[in-house]
Regions:
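Conserved catalytic/acceptor-binding region of the Class I
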Residues: 193, 214-303
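Class I SAM-dependent methyltransferase Rossmann-like catalytic core
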Residues: 45-120
Length: 356
């Protein structure tokens, strides 16, 4: 379905129901663009001619802050995020939770792209901002006939990976050293608050896609706070997100709005997607335990924002504790859902690109 600014009754929103089932709800409040191995080691440098030395550079720096290891997003930016084992475990737990809920590690027409991959004509996937590499390794296991590359500024990926999976360290703020039109699928997840210019990441991804390739985005755009089934956000939740948003902006980073994303993607092909709502701490059947795991994960995410809110926003530790506790209180007494935006763009076949 192509993008349109006009709300439509045909737009779909995907809900993960408290009983674990999936249901499509029709709504007029969502726009069309949000419809809803053998021993192997990780590679850190590729010596082939098409790669450049920028692979080992990165825009941010690692620091010790209180009892956490923080990666500052930019040298002149005070925002950052933890990269220690606690945060790595949180990210991987969120991946596994979403994989169980959605049934696959992806959301979108991935099989349409990968079904023609063969030994003589292997498809290629790029995972930008791969983090712990859990998504890339999962996809490599699931599609052994496809080559998967993960790239990030932080070296926290595993050493033992499937034979068709490789990881590289690179500066995401600069052009990646890949030829134009060299990937069939590019995946970007939870990167909108971890880079200085998310739209520029998207623009670069589109140039790296082959014609008929697929760009997959899975994010929480516009700092969308947890909501009730009726799209109501409790005051404690909203106060925390307002604080985080202000701190993010004060840190020298631009808050990426959904309309900015759509504007960047509009020329790349038809934009489709879903708004996925996941129950937090409530539900029946299999969702009883899964939603509780989601609640624990969300509490860990709240703590991961402490650095940005205190150092970037100028709040005190005590103020952060008050705000975060109000957030948690609302999570525990209200039936809320986390809002995830899943968007995908299929690049047209007849696209001409100029070499850089």
């Amino acid at each position: 379905m192509p993008y349109s600014d006009t709300p439509t009754k045909q737009t779909q929103r995907l809900f993960l129901q408290p009983d674990g089932s999936k249901a499509l709800r029709r709504t007029e409040s969502i726009r069309k663009y949000v419809m809803s191995p053998s021993p192997i080691s990780k590679s850190s440098i590729d010596t082939s001619p098409e790669f450049s030395s920028t692979f080992m550079s990165r825009s941010g720096t690692e620091i010790r802050w209180k009892d956490r290891t923080i990666y500052r997003i930019g040298r002149n930016v005070t925002a950052g995020y933890p990269i220690d084992l606690i945060e790595q475990e949180r990210q991987e737990a969120e991946h596994h939770l979403l994989r169980i809920l959605l049934g696959y590690p992806y959301h979108g027409p991935v099989l349409d792209i990968l079904k023609s991959s063969s030994r003589m004509n292997r498809k290629r996937i790029l995972d930008m901002g791969t983090g712990t590499g859990i998504w890339a390794t999962d996809m490599a296991d699931l599609f052994p006939h496809v080559d998967v590359i993960g790239t990030d500024e932080v070296d926290i990926q595993p050493e033992l990976v499937p034979p068709n999976c490789e990881f590289y360290i690179s500066d995401l703020t600069k052009p990646l050293p890949y030829p134009l039109s060299s990937f069939d699928i590019i995946h970007i997840r939870f990167l909108s608050t971890r880079v200085q210019s998310y739209p520029s990441i998207l623009s670069q991804a589109l140039t790296l896609l082959r014609p008929n390739g697929l760009l997959l985005l899975f994010e929480n755009f516009t700092f969308s706070p947890p909501q009730t089934v009726h799209d109501i956000t409790p005051k404690g939740v909203q106060a925390f997100y307002d604080c985080y948003k202000r701190s993010f902006s004060s840190s020298g980073l631009k808050v990426c709005k959904l309309e900015d994303v759509v504007g960047t993607l509009r020329g790349g092909g038809d934009i489709k997607g879903d708004l996925i709502k996941v129950p937090i701490g409530h539900g029946t059947g299999r969702m009883t335990q899964l939603s509780k795991i989601h609640l624990i994960n969300l509490k860990a995410w709240i703590e991961s924002t402490r650095y940005t809110i205190i150092e970037g926003g100028g709040y005190t530790n005590n103020e952060f504790d008050i705000l975060s506790q109000a957030f948690i209180d609302d999570l525990e007494k209200e039936e809320l859902y986390t809002c995830y935006h899943s968007l995908w763009v299929k690049k047209p076949t007849n696209v001409s690109q100029n070499s850089e």
